[in-house]
């Protein structure tokens, strides 16, 4: 089950909630993010932010404001993403990828070392490049997010996609 740190008062009082409308609200091309925090934290955040970001285009701001007026759009998101996660995990369970626990996100991490093909011996970044170019499914090596880039054979897939896209990806991944 997905829970926000903002739902826990002690965490909310000392946390920045940083997110993206794109993935959170399933409008992935929009590239608009947001930060929510208590006033004392946002005051400090704005000191840095004002020199890094100028503005977001006006039509996107109006579109998102209109979208947020209907609470059902965001109140139904946990069930929406849980359904996508379950669908994608069930499909991946029919592959040789080892599914890893990844709660509270729209990414599914997998270990590819059990796949019986020569490419499974590639380092994560090279495996992801091969997977994208040869199989047509994009993945990101999790080592890209760590200072210690020791290979772990773990990559992540995003399941914040249309069902047809997920189906096509699963068919390709199941062929490995």
PLM segments and residue spans:
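PLP-dependent class I/II
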Residues: 1-176
């Amino acid at each position: 089950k997905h829970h926000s740190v903002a739902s826990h008062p002690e965490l909310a009082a000392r946390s920045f909630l940083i997110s993206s409308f794109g993935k959170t609200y399933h409008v992935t091309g929009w590239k608009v993010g947001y930060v929510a925090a208590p006033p004392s934290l946002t005051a400090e955040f704005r000191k840095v932010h004002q020199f890094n970001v100028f503005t977001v285009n006006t039509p996107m701001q109006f579109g998102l404001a209109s979208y947020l007026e209907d609470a059902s759009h965001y109140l139904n998101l946990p069930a929406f993403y849980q359904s996508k996660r379950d669908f994608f995990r069930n499909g991946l369970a029919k592959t040789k990828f080892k599914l890893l626990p990844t709660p509270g996100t729209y990414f599914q991490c997998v270990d590819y070392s059990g796949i019986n093909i020569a490419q499974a011996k590639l380092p994560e970044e090279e495996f992801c490049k091969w997977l994208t170019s040869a199989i047509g499914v994009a993945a990101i090596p999790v080592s890209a997010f760590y200072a210690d880039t020791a290979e772990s054979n773990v990559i992540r897939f995003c399941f914040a996609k249309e069902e047809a896209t997920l189906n096509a990806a699963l068919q390709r991944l199941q062929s490995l």
